[in-house]
Amino acid sequence: MSEAVGIVVALQANYLEVELDQAPEQGLSRLLCTRRTRLSHRGETVHVGDRVRVEAIDPVQARAVVSGVEPRCSWLTRPQVANVSLVVVALAVDQPAFDPDQASRFLLTAERTGLPVQLLLTKGDLMEEHQRFALVERLMGWGYDSLVVSSQTGEGVEVLSQRLKDTELAVLCGPSGVGKSSVLNCLMPHLALRVGAVSGRLQRGRHTTRHVELFPIAPGSRVADTPGFNRPDLPDDPSELGMLFPELRVQLSPWPCRFRDCLHRQEPGCGINREWERFEFYKDALQECSDLSRPSRAG
């Protein structure tokens, strides 16, 4: 076999791991690859999740060279993953404590992809049942049907497993320390992914996942584990923000405002009901977006 097609399942430094659609008669189905120089010359980047063509296959050494990248159907910039079909935002109910502003930032980032979003509440065993119910109801008001899981008790793991098995490529993202790797260990115990504790004073997790990697959860279905980070950026364009809030989005169709450039703060002719929990966060986010989009006067 001189050429083949596969998917990039991991990327570190100058090397890519590619899992072939069809393994060679002799050798492994996963190859350690470099990139052809011409890809860089053409400005073609290669990321985890990309469908690629490989050549110069050495089945004995399990080596090859990536010679081309297939067109992408979707693209996430942070974390950088291609061809995603579901974004799973993982947030802990405690340790670290649930932070509504941080949660909103992650959800806005997920909504910007235009892909389906699943909200996952981890460490469910750390909160009393009535508190969890209240949190789930609160997030329902945000427009999200949350799934509560616990890597300690196994609660919700089977439901999550089925959700992921019905998806071609799901990306699991969220703040550091919310237990993403622990959840994946429950789903696929053979992975034995490294996990870490949450630091005490700042209540932030330590980065135990260092790079993006795809894991097969069922034939034709993969899930991406990603490094955690704690403060996603907001959009540069303030006019983009409103459609990223599901509870506001339902009020925007059909358009209820007098002017097409209404930002739904308190402008004349605005037809939006302001009695929703995240309205204050929305206004603060609008201000931040406006500051980002304003040209700098620094010389």
Curated annotation (Swiss-Prot):
Keyword GTP-binding among record annotations: yes
Protein task: One of several proteins that assist in the late maturation steps of the functional core of the 30S ribosomal subunit. Helps release RbfA from mature subunits. May play a role in the assembly of ribosomal proteins into the subunit. Circularly permuted GTPase that catalyzes slow GTP hydrolysis, GTPase activity is stimulated by the 30S ribosomal subunit.
Organism: Parasynechococcus marenigrum (strain WH8102)
Keyword set, alphabetical order: Cytoplasm, GTP-binding, Hydrolase, Metal-binding, Nucleotide-binding, Ribosome biogenesis, RNA-binding, rRNA-binding, Zinc
Subunit structure: Monomer. Associates with 30S ribosomal subunit, binds 16S rRNA.
UniProt protein name: Small ribosomal subunit biogenesis GTPase RsgA
GO MF term set: GTP binding; GTPase activity; metal ion binding; rRNA binding
Matching PANTHER family: SMALL RIBOSOMAL SUBUNIT BIOGENESIS GTPASE RSGA, SMALL RIBOSOMAL SUBUNIT BIOGENESIS GTPASE RSGA 1, MITOCHONDRIAL-RELATED
Predominant place of localization: cytoplasm
Biological process, per Gene Ontology: ribosomal small subunit biogenesis
Pfam families: RsgA_GTPase
